[in-house]
Amino acid sequence: FELAPVSGAALTGGTNGEITGTSYQNYLDKIESYAYNTMGVVTTDEVIKRLYVSFNKRLRDEMGIKFQLVVYDYPKADYLGVISIKNKCLDGVYKGDDGKKVYPNEAAAVYWTTGAEGGCKVNASVQNRAYDGEYTVEAEYTQAELIAAVKAGEFVFHSVNDDIRVLDDINTMVSTTDTFGDVFKDNQTIRVCDQIANDDALVFANKYIGRVPNDEPGRNALWMDLVKINQELQKLRAIENFKDTDVVVYQGDTKKSVVVEMAVTPV
């Protein structure tokens, strides 16, 4: 038989389960073994946000699994792997019993931002991209408020004539060090670094572990593969000023370990 396209068909017979803290933890347990660029969690619960930020930090820093996390209103993460959206969504707002406004879809901008960041090319940025999501984003800010938001590490939408656009493609990192300077506040920098880390790990796992001896010819072959990855990124204009001498591969402390040192300059 032939399938016909259908738009807006309602599903029937289903029920909504209760989402609990255990549900969020179960998801993290399941997703840990998968590869992805960006994860989003749509919640206003501070405990859940803290759980996901801790997960992101653990995987990035301890396991070398590189991805960025998109959350709503959590700039205190102060971390290059976490993107915090400032804007609330206004859809469905109502007054509660106490007379205060309640925003049931307050964190819904996470949906669009997660897709935009996850689908962004390694040589591109989400900066100044027009918002075309289905939710109504609150975006009326003064210039002083926008400047303060960027300084605080907030990913913010703002009004530009008749459009709503991303002001700057930044993460929550505001505390810099000698190792991690201002350039790491830019999500394009993180995309490039994550792409290299993930590609290098994939090549090493698929071609070298258990297959190629850790001797000079084997390490030279690995060096050539890693150089090729960076050369391709330079062709894409994701990095610049790359030289093959920027990659160094040598034996580690044990016969089974390899150390790679690499210098790259994201555009």
Placement of each model-derived feature along the sequence:
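Surface-exposed assembly/interface segments
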Residues: 1-267
